[in-house]
Structures are given as structure tokens and as C-alpha cells.
Amino acid sequence: RLSFEVSDRYVLARSISDSQVAAAQVGRDSIVTRMNEVFADGGTVVCLPSTVSPAPLIGQKVSARHSLRLRNSALTSIAGNTGRPQISLPITELEGMPVGLSLLGDLGSDAMLIAMAQEISAAL
């Protein structure tokens, strides 16, 4: 059985038109172009928060979780949309909840990104 949120995404996906897919592809291509510019010099690693806020509380309203998921997608979809590796590290806590730092690497930088994550983790 799927949760409401997952079921809702399937229903939404079935309603997407070809023109909406084409428009989304234009947006995705724009993201890829921008990330190609960011990583053009080689050796770049982008550091960004893993999420926009600590994890939602158990029992939080669906509407609040939906809003959080939409805001988080701006951070969490970059790697998937561009084919780049991303790793998230638990860096600290805020009010007892983990706060993560994501490292986003260039195409093919997986091993370097893992090594960097290991160094950061060892230093904490």
C-alpha cells in the first residue's frame, strides 16, 4: 500500500501532458547548462544544505509535508536532473534533529566526492 503522498504523485504523473513534459525538459536543460558552467573549471564541489529545514515531525499535517517537499526539491533534484553525484553528511543537530550538508560533484567525480566526504566526517 502506498502513502497518500506517493499515491498523489502517481495520480499527478498520469495527468501530465506532452506539452508539460516538453516545458519541463526546457527547464531541465537550463539547469544542466547552468551546472555545466559552475563545473567548467574542473575540481569544483558545490556545498549546499541537504534540506531546507530539519526533518518533519511525526504526525505533521500532510499540507505542511507537501510544502516542505516542494521546497526541498530545489535542493535535492539538482544531482538527479544533471547526472552528477551528490552525498549528504550529517554535520550537526538543531533542536535535537540532524542537519545535513550535501556535496555536489561534477560528472565522474564520484570517488573524489566520497573521499572528501570521508575527510570531512573524520574531522567532525
Name each region found by the language model.
Residues 1-29, 88-97:
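Short helix-loop capping/hinge segments that flank enzyme active sites or metal/cofactor-binding pockets
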Residues 23, 55-73:
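Short, surface-exposed loop/helix-turn segments at secondary-structure junctions
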Residues 25-33, 68-69:
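Short gly/ser/thr-rich secondary-structure transition/capping motifs
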Residues 42-44:
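Short, high-confidence coil segments that cap the C-terminus of an alpha-helix
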Residues 50:
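Glycine-rich, N-terminal phosphate-binding loop of Rossmann-like dinucleotide-binding domains
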Residues 66-89:
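Small-aliphatic-rich amphipathic alpha-helix that forms the alpha element of a beta-alpha
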Residues 81-124:
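Structural helix-boundary/capping segments
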